[in-house]
Amino acid sequence: MSTAARRRLMRDFKRMQTDPPAGVSASPVPDNVMTWNAVIIGPADTPFEDGTFRLVMQFEEQYPNKPPQVKFISEMFHPNVYATGELCLDILQNRWSPTYDVAAVLTSIQSLLNDPNTGSPANVEASNLYKDNRKEYTKRVRETVEKSWED
């Protein structure tokens, strides 16, 4: 069945193949364009550098009018990531726009890694360490980077 959401997701997929943003990749799972597997590489010169973080993106038929649900599969220690892997990111909630595509979502998440919003933490411990003890925060992040290589 070809719906507007599915057509849009196929366009997003073609764009990811022909003009991939640096450090992110994504593609639909076999036989289901509404579920995507994605990978974000930790940005250079950040505690997340060289990490390979896996995510799953779940789209509904209302896409692009409704944002996807995005969740880290890889362990993540970050102020804006819940223990479940779900993200607290404004563009996935109240600041969503139908102009955003898969690439925009993933690059926004990649940017969030080194620029967390500590005013709205999903992980209070990570937020407090980020603000008050950057050395320990960096150590904990580096531990998740090393675990990401094992996934």
UniProtKB/Swiss-Prot annotation:
<dbReference type="GO" id="GO:0016567">
    <property type="term" value="P:protein ubiquitination"/>
</dbReference>
<keyword id="KW-0804">Transcription</keyword>
<keyword id="KW-0833">Ubl conjugation pathway</keyword>
<protein>
    <recommendedName>
        <fullName>Ubiquitin-conjugating enzyme E2 2</fullName>
        <ecNumber>2.3.2.23</ecNumber>
    </recommendedName>
</protein>
<dbReference type="GO" id="GO:0005634">
    <property type="term" value="C:nucleus"/>
</dbReference>
<keyword id="KW-0749">Sporulation</keyword>
<keyword id="KW-0539">Nucleus</keyword>
<keyword id="KW-0805">Transcription regulation</keyword>
<dbReference type="InterPro" id="IPR016135">
    <property type="entry name" value="UBQ-conjugating_enzyme/RWD"/>
</dbReference>
<keyword id="KW-0808">Transferase</keyword>
<keyword id="KW-0963">Cytoplasm</keyword>
<feature type="active site" description="Glycyl thioester intermediate">
    <location>
        <position position="88"/>
    </location>
</feature>
<dbReference type="Pfam" id="PF00179">
    <property type="entry name" value="UQ_con"/>
</dbReference>
<keyword id="KW-0156">Chromatin regulator</keyword>
<feature type="domain" description="UBC core">
    <location>
        <begin position="4"/>
        <end position="150"/>
    </location>
</feature>
<keyword id="KW-0234">DNA repair</keyword>
<comment type="pathway">
    <text>Protein modification; protein ubiquitination.</text>
</comment>
<keyword id="KW-0227">DNA damage</keyword>
<dbReference type="InterPro" id="IPR000608">
    <property type="entry name" value="UBQ-conjugat_E2_core"/>
</dbReference>
<dbReference type="GO" id="GO:0030435">
    <property type="term" value="P:sporulation resulting in formation of a cellular spore"/>
</dbReference>
<comment type="similarity">
    <text>Belongs to the ubiquitin-conjugating enzyme family.</text>
</comment>
<comment type="function">
    <text>Catalyzes the covalent attachment of ubiquitin to other proteins. Plays a role in transcription regulation by catalyzing the monoubiquitination of histone H2B to form H2BK123ub1. H2BK123ub1 gives a specific tag for epigenetic transcriptional activation and is also a prerequisite for H3K4me and H3K79me formation. Also involved in postreplication repair of UV-damaged DNA, in N-end rule-dependent protein degradation and in sporulation.</text>
</comment>
<dbReference type="GO" id="GO:0005737">
    <property type="term" value="C:cytoplasm"/>
</dbReference>
<dbReference type="InterPro" id="IPR050113">
    <property type="entry name" value="Ub_conjugating_enzyme"/>
</dbReference>
<keyword id="KW-0547">Nucleotide-binding</keyword>
<dbReference type="GO" id="GO:0006325">
    <property type="term" value="P:chromatin organization"/>
</dbReference>
<dbReference type="GO" id="GO:0005524">
    <property type="term" value="F:ATP binding"/>
</dbReference>
<dbReference type="InterPro" id="IPR023313">
    <property type="entry name" value="UBQ-conjugating_AS"/>
</dbReference>
<dbReference type="GO" id="GO:0061631">
    <property type="term" value="F:ubiquitin conjugating enzyme activity"/>
</dbReference>
<dbReference type="GO" id="GO:0006281">
    <property type="term" value="P:DNA repair"/>
</dbReference>
<keyword id="KW-0067">ATP-binding</keyword>
